[in-house]
A protein has these predicted regions:
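Short aromatic-glycine-(Arg/Gly/Cys) micro-motifs in beta-strand/loop hairpins
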Residues: 2-20
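Generic detector of N-terminal low-structure segments
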Residues: 11, 21-23, 69, 76
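A short, exposed loop/beta-hairpin motif centered on an aromatic-Gly-Thr core
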Residues: 17-30
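Structured catalytic/translocation cores of nucleotide/phosphate-coupled proteins
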Residues: 18, 36, 41-42
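Short, mixed-charge low-complexity intrinsically disordered segments
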Residues: 40-87
Length: 87
């Protein structure tokens, strides 16, 4: 029996004060985890330069209390306008 490969993906977006973070995955949870990994890498880099900001830059476990994550779902080979499928 053959199984069909996933024909879609999800993009998780989080807009902070200075940057738009994105993560992509086959579903919302994997997209969210990819986004949080990007945030963790960003935070680690910042704290290497500014260790005194540890308390003011939230970690990935608490970032969602500060910024909302939005999800965009896409189908492969489809065309979109402003997040809405047109073809």
């Amino acid at each position: 029996m053959e199984t069909e490969a996933s024909t879609g993906f999800v993009v998780a977006e989080m807009n902070t004060h200075h940057f738009m973070f994105r993560g992509a995955g086959l579903n919302r949870e994997t997209a969210r985890l990819a986004l949080l990994n990007a945030w963790r890498a960003h935070r680690t880099t910042l704290l290497a330069r500014y260790p005194e900001r540890t308390d003011s830059i939230p970690d990935e476990g608490s970032i969602e209390a500060h910024f909302k994550i939005h999800y965009l779902e896409f189908a492969a080979d489809a065309g979109y306008r402003d997040g809405e499928r047109v073809v």
